[in-house]
Amino acid sequence: AFLTLTPGSHVDSYVEA
């Protein structure tokens, strides 16, 4: 995703998953 620097993070997760 674009919100966090760690792909698969809980913040990144809602936008990718």
UniProtKB/Swiss-Prot annotation:
Keywords: Neuropeptide
Molecular function as annotated in GO: neuropeptide hormone activity
Gene Ontology biological process terms in this record: neuropeptide signaling pathway
Record carries keyword Membrane: no
GO cellular component: extracellular region
InterPro entries (UniProt xref): Pea-VEAacid
Any single Pfam family the record assigns to this protein: Pea-VEAacid
Keyword DNA repair: no
Protein name: Peptide hormone 3
